[in-house]
From Swiss-Prot:
This is Large ribosomal subunit protein uL3. One of the primary rRNA binding proteins, it binds directly near the 3'-end of the 23S rRNA, where it nucleates assembly of the 50S subunit. It holds the Pfam family Ribosomal_L3. It comes from Chromohalobacter salexigens (strain ATCC BAA-138 / DSM 3043 / CIP 106854 / NCIMB 13768 / 1H11). The gene is rplC. InterPro entries: Ribosomal_uL3, Ribosomal_uL3_bac/org-type, Ribosomal_uL3_CS, Transl_B-barrel_sf. Keywords: Methylation, Ribonucleoprotein, Ribosomal protein, RNA-binding, rRNA-binding. It comes from the Bacteria. The modification N5-methylglutamine is found at Q152. GO terms for cellular component: cytosolic large ribosomal subunit. Methylated by PrmB. The keyword Ribosomal protein applies. One of its GO terms (molecular function) is rRNA binding. Part of the 50S ribosomal subunit. Forms a cluster with proteins L14 and L19. GO terms for biological process: translation.
Length: 212
């Protein structure tokens, strides 16, 4: 199964097992994902299903997006997300809903989100560089990165050099997290461990690649 769900991170809590062990979980609220389009090999060159969730005012839509929602007869959502279909995988109908019942407790999933932005940070925090000596003549350079290259040859800093810069606010995927509980009545997924992003940010839940 390659179809996933678009949800919203609600925060973290913990639950207790029958043995009394405390398990940290992330609560993901998954409103029913509405199918807006089904792509096929004949018409688009590949098989995929396009979904949306939540709601959005019509005045905030582009003409292209408004036309697509009108064509499919689906209420406009926050964003459009596409999931590729595996060969032979059955596609849902346009206008139908995909709910949390897609997953079950004990299943492994990959969760994708946008990590918290931490602004401009130095090499020690951004790349876990060790700090320089506190003594032995060193002053004002305890958290400096040190040498970043050579001299006249090559006369430049190589691309990809680990230096200070923007930390966070990037797309991150955490793989093989276990679903502890599925609450179909309240549209909730309880996933063991932490997932990327701040509270109320959008996350994508897919079946784990390494478990397929």
């Amino acid at each position: 199964m390659t179809i996933g769900l678009v949800g919203k991170k609600s925060g973290m809590t913990r639950i207790f097992t029958e043995n009394g062990a405390s398990v940290p979980v992330t609560v993901i609220e998954v409103e029913p994902n509405r199918v807006t389009r089904v792509k096929t090999v004949e018409s688009d060159g590949y098989s995929a299903v396009q979904v949306t969730s939540g709601s959005r005012k019509a005045k905030h839509l582009t003409k292209a997006a408004a036309g697509q929602y009108a064509k499919s007869g689906v209420e406009a959502g926050r964003s459009l997300m596409e999931f590729r279909l595996a060969e032979g995988e059955e596609a849902p109908e346009v206008g139908g809903n995909i709910t949390v019942s897609l997953f079950e407790a004990g299943q492994k999933v990959d969760v994708t989100g946008t990590s918290k932005g931490k602004g401009f940070q130095g090499a020690v925090k951004r790349w876990n560089f060790r700090t320089q000596d506190n003594g032995h003549g060193n002053s004002l350079a305890h958290r400096a990165p040190g040498s970043i290259g050579q001299c006249q040859t090559p006369g430049r800093v190589f691309k990809g050099k680990k230096m200070a810069g923007q930390l966070g606010n990037e797309r991150v995927t955490v793989q093989s997290l276990e679903i502890v509980r599925v609450d179909a009545e309240r549209n909730l997924l309880l996933v063991k461990g932490a997932v990327p992003g701040a509270t109320d940010c959008e996350v994508i839940v897919r079946s784990a690649v390494k478990a397929r």
